[in-house]
Amino acid sequence: MSKIKGNVKWFNESKGFGFITPEDGSKDVFVHFSAIQSNGFKTLSEGQSVEFEITEGAKGPSAANVISL
């Protein structure tokens, strides 16, 4: 799988999910906190730069292996 760069559109800490806007202008991608590769509390900030892979989830594309840049 190839890595894609993007920016966090929004992320709801209490619900544990949000969306990432890919740099290539493609459709926003769903992200769940379990896909975030970090130690401690897994969260993302609006506008944060990230790198991720896309997998096909039950409800469409979702981000996997999300790394903060």
Curated annotation (Swiss-Prot):
Localization: Cytoplasm
GO cellular component, one term: cytosol
MF annotations from Gene Ontology: DNA binding
Residue intervals of the CSD domain: 6-66
Signal peptide coordinates: none
Chief subcellular location: cytoplasm
Organism superkingdom: Bacteria
Keywords of this entry: Activator, Cytoplasm, DNA-binding, Transcription, Transcription regulation
Disulfide bond listed as a keyword: no
Keyword DNA repair: no
The protein's name in its UniProt record: Cold shock-like protein CspE
Gene source species: Buchnera aphidicola subsp. Baizongia pistaciae (strain Bp)
Name of the gene: cspE
